[in-house]
């Protein structure tokens, strides 16, 4: 068996990267592989199953409609009829989900809550994509975005398109600087929204 150092050294050689960068690039490459959308898989098993596989592969958890328990083990995803398990909530705490994977969410029709906490690969593009998905515009009721350092005002303001959003928690987001503008934009677009800001 080849040691990790040799493998990553070979990967760096292929990409012509300096050895000191190999670990960072290796993990970035691996996370991109985990996030890659397989449209054939979505067609074969349905959007909820394919999205569950993506989320769990990246370290997130899902809870299905009508169930109390969070599903966090990829190897114990439930089997059965494709339309039986519908994702109701997503907890992406400490996960490696990134924008290239967000097309997995396109067919989801029952997601009510999303928690993004310490997601180092989440950027404004992710929130923009999320807010453009018509199904999610209708179903998402609650969102929490905590300690995601790459999120700025641009990404947050896009969430005003989630027209049934009732609760939004924003905490420890150093890239969010225009708090007053955000508050005003959400008051105008979503007057019944409970907006909680824990920002500096």
UniProtKB/Swiss-Prot annotation:
- The answer to keyword rRNA processing applying to this record is no
- State where the protein is found: Mitochondrion; Mitochondrion inner membrane
Task: Give me any GO biological process, just one.
Answer: proton transmembrane transport
Transit peptide where, by residue? Answer: 1-25
**Entry keywords, A to Z:** ATP synthesis, CF(0), Hydrogen ion transport, Ion transport, Leucine-rich repeat, Magnesium, Membrane, Metal-binding, Mitochondrion, Mitochondrion inner membrane, Repeat, Transit peptide, Transport
One Gene Ontology CC term in the entry: mitochondrial inner membrane
Q: Which domain of life is it from?
A: Eukaryota
Region of interest (N-terminal domain), residue spans:
1-61
Which positions in this protein are listed as binding Mg(2+)?
59, 93
Q: Name one GO molecular function term.
A: proton transmembrane transporter activity
The segments carrying the LRR repeats are 62-87, 88-116, 117-141, 142-173
InterPro entries recorded for this chain?
A: LRR_dom_sf
The record describes the protein's role as: Involved in regulation of mitochondrial membrane ATP synthase. Necessary for H(+) conduction of ATP synthase. Facilitates energy-driven catalysis of ATP synthesis by blocking a proton leak through an alternative proton exit pathway.
Q: Which family does it belong to?
A: Belongs to the ATP synthase subunit s family.
Assembly description: Homotetramer. Associates with ATP synthase.
Protein name as it appears in the record: ATP synthase subunit s, mitochondrial
């Amino acid at each position: 068996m080849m040691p990790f150092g040799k493998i990553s050294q070979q990967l760096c050689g292929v990409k012509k990267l300096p050895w000191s960068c190999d670990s960072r690039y290796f993990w970035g490459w691996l996370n991109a592989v985990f996030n890659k959308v397989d449209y054939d898989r979505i067609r074969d098993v349905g959007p909820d199953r394919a999205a569950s596989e993506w989320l769990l592969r990246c370290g997130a958890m899902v809870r299905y409609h009508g169930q109390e328990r969070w599903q966090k083990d990829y190897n114990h995803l439930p089997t059965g009829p494709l339309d039986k398990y519908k994702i109701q909530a997503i907890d992406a705490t400490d996960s490696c989900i990134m924008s290239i994977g967000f097309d997995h969410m396109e067919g989801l029709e029952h997601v009510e809550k999303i928690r993004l906490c310490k997601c180092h690969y989440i950027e404004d593009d992710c929130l923009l994509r999320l807010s453009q998905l018509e199904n999610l515009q209708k179903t998402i009721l609650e969102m929490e975005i905590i300690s995601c350092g790459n999120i700025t005002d641009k990404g947050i303001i896009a969430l005003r398109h989630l027209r049934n959003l009732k609760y939004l928690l924003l905490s420890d987001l150093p890239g969010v600087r225009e708090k007053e503008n955000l508050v005003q934009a959400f008051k105008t677009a979503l007057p019944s929204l409970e907006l909680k800001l824990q920002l500096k």
